[in-house]
């Protein structure tokens, strides 16, 4: 009886454990029917840690490829204590017998049950050491939890790899749930980012290309643009990050382009082919031309040099203001000048006549080249060839209207004051010290020097610096019938007593086209004189953009009348 009581006690303990396992696992696995003594307390205590170990179970469930083999072993192990299992039915306990009978039938039936056994995760560390333990709630109480053997290290590494794969699959699953909308958003985001990146690259490309050739729309006549010799090379150099190398290459590019432009200067400065002021000044002001670039065969080639000389006076604030003023371009277009003379806009103060000074230098040397002597015939033919296109453009009606009606009314006091002014060491006739292209031949400079010596010897009164006076002293030969009585200085008559007669004879014989040009230049001079006041050379300009824009328009109305 004692044995019979003891046996049911053991059977009761086993049945209670099995019933707990059946309640935990809805599948009703027969594996846990007779657990071994070692993992049984772990399984009993593991009920508390079920929620904490679910993720590890998933990893082990996917990672264990050896479960089918374990399932074949486990059904054999309950056979050892299987002798205890038949003992409870003779004990005449209905509930334990009812609980044990289905397990025996399930174990004997086989069939679908072994497949369910493989689904139960087991502890891999315990398996390495020959023990099968259920993983649920087993992690904290595993005997080989901190084992460092080779097999356990391999298990740990495999678990890490499987966890990474699970995380990757979960991320991909969430992306698939979002569908194509997420991908479309990514594409839009990439497109916006690429647009933001490409905009500065286009700007850098335009900067690296340097001075781009002006298109045909910038010209009034629509001439061909300058050839772009370096744009392809600059595009290939966009990957370079050396700023110093970029500056050197751009400087070389400017010089090459300047040489090409000077060869086409005559075509660019025709009346219908004016270059806008800001573009020309921004390009020309960067690099000063070297000597010998301009050929002196054509008479009209002094015009780019004239602009270069005015650009060299950028040290004063007046020149910078005028060259950077946008109204310069409009005054270029509003002046109805001939094709061989380009006049800077008329400014009020005398200090602004620095702009006129270089033009006067070119104009007076060209007129002195026409004096009777060695170069008269040659220069006359050059001027005739150069001005042949002007005769068709100018109607003869403009002859009387080119000179303004207030020209004879210039006060004699101002004329005498400007006639008797001292010729400074550096006047409009003195060659500038900077390097620039030769304007006329050497015989013209020799004649000019002769006039300079006469003027400097006979003139002794110190006065204001000579600025617009050379223009008046030269062009009074054509206006002697109008303003001649007002000129009382004897040295002017001595210097140019032969020039007016022969010059007028030449103009009468040939045509009146050159007189038109000189009268127009004289008109601009007198307008500048009357507007001007007695100011020092270093005073700032007293004009605005509106005043500059208004004055040429009034001059145009005078000429049209």
Swiss-Prot record:
The entry's DNA-binding region: 123-170
UniProtKB keywords: DNA-binding, Metal-binding, Nucleus, Transcription, Transcription regulation, Zinc
Disulfide partners: none
Chain intervals with Acidic residues compositional bias: 13-26, 45-67
SUPFAM superfamilies with a match to the protein in the record: Cysteine-rich DNA binding domain, (DM domain) (SSF82927)
Compositional bias (Low complexity): 68-85, 92-106
One of the GO BP terms on file: myotome development
Main location as per UniProt: nucleus
Annotated Gene Ontology cellular component terms: nucleus
Disruption phenotype: Mice heterozygous for Dmrt2 mutation exhibit no visible phenotype. Homozygotes are perinatally lethal due to signs of respiratory distress. They have rib, sternal, vertebral and skull base malformations. Expression of myogenic growth factors, such as Pax3 and Myog, the growth factor Pdgfa, cadherin Cdh2, and the filament protein Des is abnormal. Mutants lack most or all of the epithelial organization seen in wild-type somites, sclerotome and dermomyotome. Mutants have disrupted production of matrix components including laminin-1 in the dermomyotome.
Domain of life per record: Eukaryota
Subcellular location per the Swiss-Prot or TrEMBL entry: Nucleus
UniProt cross-references to Pfam families, sorted A to Z: DM
Region annotation (Disordered) ranges: 1-119
MF (Gene Ontology): DNA-binding transcription activator activity, RNA polymerase II-specific; identical protein binding; metal ion binding; RNA polymerase II transcription regulatory region sequence-specific DNA binding; sequence-specific DNA binding
UniProt tissue specificity: Expressed in testis.
InterPro entries: DM_DNA-bd, DM_DNA-bd_sf, DMRT
Record function comment: Transcriptional activator that directly regulates early activation of the myogenic determination gene MYF5 by binding in a sequence-specific manner to the early epaxial enhancer element of it. Involved in somitogenesis during embryogenesis and somite development and differentiation into sclerotome and dermomyotome. Required for the initiation and/or maintenance of proper organization of the sclerotome, dermomyotome and myotome. Is not required for sex determination and/or differentiation in embryonic development.
Family of this protein: Belongs to the DMRT family.
Subunit description: Homodimer.
Protein name: Doublesex- and mab-3-related transcription factor 2
